[in-house]
Amino acid sequence: MKKIDCFLPFINEEQYQQLCAAFEDFTSLVNIHALKESLYQSDTLQQIAKEATASYILLLTKDTPLILHYRALQRLIQLAEDTQAALLYADHYQIKAQKRINSPVIDYQLGSLRDDFNFGSLLFFNTAAFKTGVFNLKEPYQHAALYALRLCLSRHHQLVHVNEYLYTEIEEDNRKSGEKQFDYVDPRNQERQKEMERACTEHLKAVGGYLEPVFKEVDFNLTPFEYEASVIIPVKNRVGTIEAAIQSVLRQQTNFKFNLIVIDNHSDDGTSEIIDQHKGDELSLIHISE
C-alpha cells in the first residue's frame, strides 16, 4: 500500500502533467489524484477526505510547477512518524526571474491566526487528523475551508515546521510583496475576507478567546491625552522586516502626537538591537521585551 495520497490542482492537461512530473521519482510512495475544484472549498476537502486511503495526504496550494528534492517525501514521512504532527510544512526555494532564492518559513506558534500565514505550497497532512478535522468543520465554506481546517487542527495537534529545504517552487506571481500584502483590502476579495473572519470567530469561540462585541461609550474629552494614538507592533525574530516596519511609522505625518510600542517576544536574532537603535528618535518608541 502506498503511503501518500497526492492531490494536485488540475487547470489543463499540460499544467497537470508538469506537476505530475515532479513525482516521477516517488511512484512507489504516492497515489496521484487530479483536483479540479478549489482547494479552499469545504466540498473539495470532504472529497479529499473520502478518497484518501494512505497514511498521509499531500496537497499543493499552487498550480505552478515545482521540483521535489532528493528523498523529500521520505523525509516528510519520517518526520511525520517521529512528531505525530497533523501538518508538516517545509522551507523551500523559489525560482523568480530565472534566479533561485531562499524562501524559509517560520514556526507555527500557539495563537497564530493570520489567514495568509506562509506555509509554502506543499502541505503534508496526517490522514486521520485531516479527516477528523474536515468532518468537524461547522459550516460550508467557498473560500475559507483550508484556513478553518488548519485552525481546527491547531487546537488538537502539532503543526510542525520542517527546517529543511525540501522543494523548489517556480514562482509565477511577480507582483511586489507589498502589493500581495494588501490583497485583503481589495473589494474583489470582500466575500473571501468575510468567510475568513467567520472561520476565525468559530476558532476563537472554540478556544475560549472570543470576546462578545459589547462596547461602552467612552468620552475622550474627560481626560487630556498627551498622545492621541499608538502604533503597536508585536514581534519575534523579524530581523529582516522590523526596520521597515519602524520606518513606515516614522514616516507618518500627523497634526497630533503618537507613539510606537514594539512588543518584543524574546527575539534572539538581532531584532531587539535594531529596535533599540531607534530609542533616540523624535517619535516616542517604547520597547517592551517580554
Which stretches of residues belong to each language-model region?
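Short aromatic/hydrophobic "clamp" motif used to bind/position activated sugar donors
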Residues: 57
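A conserved acidic beta->alpha catalytic loop
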Residues: 11-15, 38-39, 61, 65-66, ...
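A recurrent flexible, glycine/aromatic-enriched loop bordering the glycosyltransferase active site
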Residues: 100-127
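A conserved hydrophobic helix/loop-capping motif in glycosyltransferases and polysaccharide synthases
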Residues: 4-13, 230-241, 245, 252-253, ...
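Conserved small/polar residues in nucleotide/adenosyl-binding loops
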Residues: 200, 286-290
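Conserved donor NDP-sugar-binding/catalytic core segment of glycosyltransferases
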Residues: 65, 70-102
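A short, conserved alpha-helix in the catalytic core of glycosyltransferases
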Residues: 129, 139-164, 200
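Short, acidic, metal-binding catalytic loop of nucleotide-sugar glycosyltransferases
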Residues: 18-32, 247-257
